[in-house]
Amino acid sequence: GYAVFANGGYLIEPYFISHIEDIEGNLIFKTKLQRKRTTADQVLDTRNVFTMDSLLRNVIQNGTGIRAKSLGRKDLAGKTGTTNDNIDAWFAGFQRRIVAITWVGKDQPGPLGDKETGSKAALPIWIDYMKTALKGIPEDKPLARPEGIKSILIDPKTGLPNDKNGVIEYFYEENAPRTDSGALF
């Protein structure tokens, strides 16, 4: 599911592991990929993709995924997750070329512990994996803002438009908060 956000809105068939090598670099396993497609169907509007990409990047820049900044990249996006009663913890994250999801849970469902959240239990595993997976992959630029998207400074304390203390948030033009009267529509 996250691949469609990572690649700009195109539906592709993901695969889990491309190959496995031993410590000496000998190939142990290689995935037999199906016929390589040269085209893919665009299944999400570019405005949806841009907005979701912005939201998921913010999770890493300022939110529960902030530890991923330790990778030293600005092209990462993701979402932490913790189920009720801390039974499962996960992190789903991506860079344009790689989507990886980590899950922490028990074979027989039961609480992991009060402090075992997606950001504490699953995110560190994702970071360790991505350290290796991203080696040699150049950092991507953010998506270009498509037509029909408006940026507005929103006060993080009130959620209202504010030109002074706001952070940039993106809206469909037809759904953007109005800044002229202070009313939200």
Identify the function of each model-found stretch:
Residues 2-184:
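A penicillin-recognizing enzyme superfamily signal
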